[in-house]
């Protein structure tokens, strides 16, 4: 099954992450801390914590930082108490945007998110206003040139729900979020290492932006991504090259 071009977006996302690795670490420390607080410090019984630690390892985060974050989460060390908040809104031409945050100050966070929307031509929506346009899924992106038939066999055997070959040759594997850790381990055991592996809010349909609208939309997304309390930004907008 064919899909949109993903590879350029994946490379852009990885380059952006490399450029602000310190910020990525801060976000991952929050995620590890909250995952440990909610589900305990044992990765075998806490798949969310396992995923967060895997992301930390992939981002070259020192093991000491990871362990301290776990200890803070389970109460072994003092630290800020973070809560998870989701905001929803609209960008240029009504594009749907979800903003997932972790914060120790809800008032500050909502003001900053609202300001970013307002400044860049978007607007905040109410809870549930756009979330229904997205599916909660595990996603793996494999580089162009990955053996499609072998990957499909391994993915479906591992419990994946769908395997999508994109226009640019990259391959996308989707699975239920609760099966993410199992599918990831099975794929890696079969010799397939994803360029990007995460649990996301995936848009059911996408809207492509080009020209000035693409530039405006990218500025809004960047403004939201750059807020300290923001963990993830999801959108149904595809920014054309």
Curated annotation (Swiss-Prot):
GO biological process, one term: regulation of DNA-templated transcription
Keyword terms of this UniProt record: Cytoplasm, DNA-binding, Transcription, Transcription regulation
Chief location of this protein within or outside the cell: cytoplasm
Single GO molecular function: DNA binding
Family membership noted in the UniProt record: Belongs to the TACO1 family.
Localization annotation: Cytoplasm
Protein name: Probable transcriptional regulatory protein RSc2190
Organism taxonomic ancestry: Bacteria, Pseudomonadati, Pseudomonadota, Betaproteobacteria, Burkholderiales
GO cellular component, one term: cytosol
InterPro entries: Integrase-like_N, TACO1_YebC-like_2nd/3rd_dom, TACO1_YebC_N, Transcrip_reg_TACO1-like, Transcrip_reg_TACO1-like_dom3, YebC-like
């Amino acid at each position: 099954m064919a899909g949109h071009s993903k590879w350029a977006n994946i490379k852009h996302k990885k380059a952006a992450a490399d450029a602000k690795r310190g910020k990525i670490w801060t976000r991952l420390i929050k995620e590890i801390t909250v995952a440990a607080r909610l589900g305990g410090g044992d990765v075998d019984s806490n798949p969310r914590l396992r995923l967060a630690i895997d992301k930390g390892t992939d981002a070259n985060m020192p093991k000491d930082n990871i362990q301290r974050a776990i200890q803070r989460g389970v109460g072994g060390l003092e630290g800020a108490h973070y809560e998870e908040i989701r905001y929803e809104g609209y960008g240029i031409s009504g594009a749907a945007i979800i903003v997932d945050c972790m914060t120790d100050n809800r008032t500050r966070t909502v003001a900053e998110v609202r300001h970013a929307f307002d400044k860049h031509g978007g607007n905040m929506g109410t809870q549930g206003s756009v979330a229904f346009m997205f599916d909660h899924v595990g996603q793996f992106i494999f580089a162009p040139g990955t053996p499609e038939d072998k990957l499909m066999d391994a993915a479906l055997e591992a419990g994946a729900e769908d395997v999508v070959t994109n226009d640019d040759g990259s391959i996308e594997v989707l699975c239920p979020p609760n099966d993410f850790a199992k599918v990831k381990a099975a794929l890696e055991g079969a010799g397939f290492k994803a360029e990007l592996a995460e649990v996301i809010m995936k848009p059911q349909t996408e809207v492509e932006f080009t020209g000035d609208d693409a530039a405006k939309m990218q500025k809004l997304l960047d403004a939201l991504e750059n807020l300290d309390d923001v963990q993830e930004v999801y959108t149904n907008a595809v920014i054309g090259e």
